[in-house]
């Protein structure tokens, strides 16, 4: 028998400043993304976490994307 879906899901976090930054401000091209898990029962809204962005070489706000 198959198990039902768990409460923990995998989410992707994307840097909010990488999209608006010009190429001259970035250390390397692209957008910083992290994958993590969240508990659907405890955290119903989208995650917003300060994480290190290697493209901008500083701590930036990372928001959950679909």
UniProtKB/Swiss-Prot annotation:
One of its GO terms (cellular component) is cytoplasm. PANTHER family: 50S RIBOSOMAL PROTEIN L33, CHLOROPLASTIC (PTHR43168), LARGE RIBOSOMAL SUBUNIT PROTEIN BL33C (PTHR43168:SF2). It comes from Synechococcus sp. (strain CC9902). Signal peptide: none annotated. Belongs to the bacterial ribosomal protein bL33 family. InterPro entries: Ribosomal_bL33, Ribosomal_bL33_CS, Ribosomal_bL33_sf, Ribosomal_zn-bd. It holds the Pfam family Ribosomal_L33. GO terms for molecular function: structural constituent of ribosome. GO terms for biological process: translation. The keyword Ligase does not apply. This is Large ribosomal subunit protein bL33. Keywords: Ribonucleoprotein, Ribosomal protein. Gene3D superfamilies: Ribosomal protein L33.
């Amino acid at each position: 028998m198959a198990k039902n879906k768990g409460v923990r899901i995998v989410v992707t976090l994307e840097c909010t400043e990488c999209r608006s930054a010009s190429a001259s401000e970035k250390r390397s091209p692209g957008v910083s993304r992290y994958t993590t898990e969240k508990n659907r029962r405890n955290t119903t809204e989208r995650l917003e976490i300060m994480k290190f962005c290697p493209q901008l070489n500083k701590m930036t706000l990372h928001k959950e994307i679909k």
